[in-house]
Amino acid sequence: MADDEFIGRERECAQLASPIAEALRGHGSLILVAGEAGVGKTTLARQALSRSGLTVLEGFATPGGASAFAPLVEVLRAHLRSARDGPLVEGPLADHLALLLPELGRSAPQGDPAALFEAIRLALATIAAQQPTAIFLDDLQWADDATLELLPALARTLSEQPLLILAAYRSDELPRAHPIRRMRSELRRSGHLKQVSVEPFDAEATAALVDRILGPVAPTLRRAVFDRTDGIPLYVTELSAALAASGRLQSGASGLDLLDGADVPLPESVRDAVLLRATGLSEDARAAAMAAAVAGQLFDPELVRAVAGLDTWPDELLRRGLVTEEPAGRMAFRHALVRDAFYSDIPWTTRIKLHRLVAQHLAAGRATPAVIAEHWVLGREPGRAREALLAAADGYCAVHAYRDGARAFRRALELWPEGEDEGSRLDVLQRLGSCAELAGDLGDAATVWREVADGRQRDGDDRGLGDAQRRLAAVLELQGRWQEALASRERAASAFTAANSPADAAAERLAAAAHLRSAGSFRAALSLLETAAQQALAAQRVDLQARILGHEGNARARMGEGQRGVELVRAGLAMALEHGLTGPAAEIYQRLADALEHAGDYSGASATYDEAYSFCSANGLEPTAQLCLACLTTVLRQSGDWDRAAKLCRQVIESPDASAHAHAVATGQLGFILGLRGQTRQARPLLLEAATIARRIELAAMELLSGWGLAIVDSVEGAPQSAAGHCWALLDRWKQTEERHFVISPLRWATTFFAESGDASGTRACAAALARIAADVGQDEPMSALSHALGETALIDGSVEQASDQFARALVLLQGYDAPFERAESQRRAAAVLAAAGRREEAVEHLVAAYRTSRRLGAKPLVNQLAAALSALGERPEVRLGKRTATQLENGGLTRREVEIVRMVATGRTNREIARELFLSPRTVEMHVSSILMKLNGRSRADAARRASELGLLTPRAD
């Protein structure tokens, strides 16, 4: 064996060698080191790093309470103790780092979590930039939640830094809800989960370790040690040392063995081995060991000496290897299991007394409240423990360690005497609710806010009840539990009304109405807005009055009262601008554009969305600006500017400021455009994502539009049954709303889809829905869609003449609208009717006009349908459309070179073989194949060959 320090760890050392080498080359990573207690994780990490060439810094977690980010703070302090270079972080971030390291000077206000994370990340990067560095974090099973939540985020930043982080934890101490499991899941999700598992020694390695400690040992003793310890290195070490100290070993022919006839029972556990080894400690040393065990794994020897009532520190513990010296004048037990052994041997009453003494000394010093609280808890002092836990919770929250803060608040509440100071208890519950929200524990937060609301109601505190119901509503909305959220909003409004706070009541009803508007429940929204308007007026809140006007006008426009709705929104906007209310004005600007869109003024809506975007951007209101852009894409798509719409969709999707609403709209519209263009492989995941978000936030318009998009995708991919399912689902969802605008085009398309599929019931159901919308709204756009639908039903009934009249009327009614895709679809269906009536020239004119429109839009599936319809009428495409266009249509959009290549792909040739035969570069062939896959909507070469066969491209045509 080259080095006895690495007994039995060849595999683990090999696993660590690669990330160490990569870190030296500037490519760091996070490596988890897992194994049961005493298996040697710490020894392995330290030995591997000691010869790595990396500067090593250590931090560790301890049981019994700690400050937020404690292991990382320990690392930073270790660096500061030895560093001679400049500051870790400069500029504003230095103040954020001072929240964790007060010795750096003035700290920032609480700030935001992102700034604190960036300060920590930059500090670690600064350390690594000075010298390639390894950070060893030990015993993370005891770490605070904040540290464990930060590590996955750090892992994503290490690949371009000379920084390796080894993080060790006990794998045998992880209950199902342990935060390490969340950390591992997040690392796995992001592709950064790397772990070295440390296993117990086998019999051979155990024997080698025993021989190293005791010298050559008889085989019988080796077997006895292995059988008793199961190869746990710490147990092997302690047991071997205990046997050596017992004086009951003798030398024999095969090595050391137990004395003949000696009754020396082997210890049953590490605890027993440690206590056996400690036999013979002086009274002072035993007192110091007990006090140190109570103080913690890492302790201040001066504090322990004072608690134990000793004049001097007994060096005996150091000599026996039970404790070790640590930086900053501290000491630590050699292993946590050694500390556990001493702690478990302390009588219960003595233990309580020692915890109280430790708490008193810590409270007189500068210890963190979390550590002090733990000693008061174990010292059976609930009042003092509660006070310290509340201070600890506040400290956690100050550095955004909200899970840790919530845990401290819960523990403080568990210690609250029943019936004592109920008002203060409810205040603490409120702080817990806020903490749970910020930690993302929404289920817990909802439970807490319900309890607060019940308590405030019992106390007759209407104001407090309103606040609690408001917070509960916000949490329920985040969970997507909208009906419960709306009920909480109403309860909050009622409580605020009872508390004579009309402004708050109006704000709650406005919030509820805003959601109902998005969900397509316009009448319910208007009912709430009516009451809210009265309360806003009573409170003299101009901002609320302006916003209520904007919402009311928008809701009325969505119900078909276009002119009145637009006038109300304009009045709200004028009010907001007159009083310099920038935020409300931005919101109402967006509502105005939406109202114009619903009133059928697409050019006005487009211009207003552009104006609203500029206004929001100029005033730093980026989330509203992104929403305006997202909504603008709907108008652009409707009016045929698909390229700009797609570009803006991508801009919104990439924006960190986009709300869920904006993201749903942009994702759905981009997927919809790609679907209309035949790029179904890219379209489907976008539409599914949009549908998921829209359902979660109850955005009815996008639920309907994404469902339509998925129907189009299925239709293009040749899955009519699935497409029909989406159409029926669209109808069902519409019936649950009062939506009268965004559903018009989907129903228009679904009517034709059902008709061409021979589904008369689906056709009639869509026509009936459009008839209801047209009656409610009375605008030309829904009337055009209804005429289109009636044309389809007339065809089903066999009345070609009536169908022709209806399609003609549909086209006339569209003349005032810039809706090219809908016009092209109606022209295609009108042409089919005209052809059936023998009016061939008129049919061809419609087809050519529709073809040119769809070609401009890039609507490839519709282009192909129109070209096929022309061919069916005996038209030569090269005459009507131009020779180049006709050839591309015949070839499924492929160029001659692409047709040549797809034929070779179908024979199984590789890109390199094709390149050789056609005297092209492999890269050029690769580009052609990618283009073929996109044009034929294929995922693989086999898909392309199959589609080419269906189009008849694999057999050369005779000229």
Segments (PLM) and residue ranges:
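Short coil/turn linkers that connect adjacent helices within long alpha-helical scaffolds
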Residues: G365-A367, G379, V399-H400, E418-D421, ...
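Conserved Walker-type P-loop NTP-binding/catalytic site
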Residues: A70-A134, S185-H192, F201-D211, G215, ...
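Alpha-helical sensor/transducer elements of the RecA-like P-loop NTPase core
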Residues: T43, L99, S159-T220, A224, ...
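P-loop NTPase Walker A phosphate-binding motif
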Residues: E36-A66
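Short secondary-structure boundary elements
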Residues: E204-W416, A774
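Tandem amphipathic alpha-helical repeat scaffolds
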Residues: G38, A341, E374, A391-A398, ...
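Extended alpha-helical scaffolding segments used for macromolecular assembly and cargo binding
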Residues: G28-L30, L44-A48, P132, D311-W313, ...
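Helix-turn-helix DNA-binding segment
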Residues: D805, S871, L881-L936, D943-D959
